[in-house]
Amino acid sequence: MRVLHVYKTYYPDTYGGIEQVIYQLSQGCARRGIAADVFTFSPDKETGPVAYEDHRVIYNKQLFEIASTPFSLKALKRFKQIKDDYDIINYHFPFPFMDMLHLSARPDARTVVTYHSDIVKQKRLMKLYQPLQERFLASVDCIVASSPNYVASSQTLKKYQDKTVVIPFGLEQHDVQHDSQRVAHWRETVGDNFFLFVGAFRYYKGLHILLDAAERSRLPVVIVGGGPLEAEVRREAQQRGLSNVVFTGMLNDEDKYILFQLCRGVVFPSHLRSEAFGITLLEGARFARPLISCEIGTGTSFINQDKVSGCVIPPNDSQALVEAMNELWNNEETSNRYGENSRRRFEEMFTADHMIDAYVNLYTTLLESKS
């Protein structure tokens, strides 16, 4: 079996949650004897297929970009040339140019859409794009959502429930022993009792809510990551005089995992539906940390269950966030219980092996139905 994943960006150009899912699937398939390639776009290179660990990547140099969507006329031709080399083509939605790739090439392979998120922000462009989106989603064989919560709340997915299945995203188990000097460095830098945010600085991440809660509570907060709003968020923290907030910038996995181990709990204040799942919540659960997230009708509340693995609060409510942080800060027994439950739920539902096995079973079923 040969599988092709299609998405707008990939390692090492970007390291977002969708890229992480594609990486896990590609590596996991390779371990199971299934060849996996990634068809993606880059601002500065056109090459491939090139080896990336145990899978391969095909990079297409983008010609221009509109609304965070890269376009390439050469990619249309290239996709048509290679489409018949694969048994399964797994598209990762949303990426509007991908719809054009599919509909122009009409591959004979079985087609799967991993539906990461509704399109939330570009409402005006959505009116132009919607007919193309509907043709694309109607034409594929199967749609995979990451949580039943998202299937129930997505107006788009309601139209395709007859071919939509749920496969939660997963992460590898983590048994790495950390370098004692790095642990000592971070313990000296940020302590070992703080609330941890990890993620891109984007409009839907709720960072303004987190800064407001940090100002009200004066509890220690460590913010890991970067992105389009980084300068704005750092400036706001400085203007508020938030000495209890530490920005680390982007970190490698080892340093990030040390902070997960040192923190009191994970805060995930995303307040808009653009946050479809929440890989950071899985990372926190993997390290048996209590979680704080918002009820936005997506996978965040599938991962984090209120009063079981942490606190689920109303979105865009900094006072509710303060109260949740205080609950974990002032009640160590409760905090530990939530953390144990989050780890148990991770092991039962959210490991990479669970996800990969489910996808391989889906691929196999689709191929058997074709024959």
Swiss-Prot record:
Q: Which UniProt keywords apply?
A: Glycosyltransferase, Lipopolysaccharide biosynthesis, Transferase
Which Pfam families does the entry mention? Glyco_transf_4, Glycos_transf_1
Q: What is its EC number?
A: 2.4.1.348
The answer to keyword Flavoprotein applying to this record is no
**What enzyme class is recorded for this protein?**
transferase
GO BP: any one term: O antigen biosynthetic process
Pathway annotation: Bacterial outer membrane biogenesis; LPS O-antigen biosynthesis
* Alphabetized InterPro entries for the sequence: Glyco_trans_1, Glyco_trans_4-like_N, Glycosyltransferase_grp1
* UniProt catalytic activity: N-acetyl-alpha-D-glucosaminyl-di-trans,octa-cis-undecaprenyl diphosphate + GDP-alpha-D-mannose = alpha-D-mannosyl-(1->3)-N-acetyl-alpha-D-glucosaminyl-di-trans,octa-cis-undecaprenyl diphosphate + GDP + H(+)
* Membrane-spanning intervals of the chain: none
Gene Ontology molecular-function annotations: glycosyltransferase activity
Q: Does the keyword Iron apply?
A: no
Q: What function does the entry list?
A: Mannosyltransferase involved in the biosynthesis of the repeat unit of the lipopolysaccharide (LPS) O-antigen region. Catalyzes the transfer of a single alpha-(1->3)-linked mannose residue to the acceptor N-acetyl-glucosaminyl-diphospho-undecaprenol during the synthesis of the adapter region.
As for family, the record states: Belongs to the glycosyltransferase group 1 family. Glycosyltransferase 4 subfamily.
Q: What is this protein called?
A: O-antigen chain mannosyltransferase C
Organism, as annotated: Escherichia coli
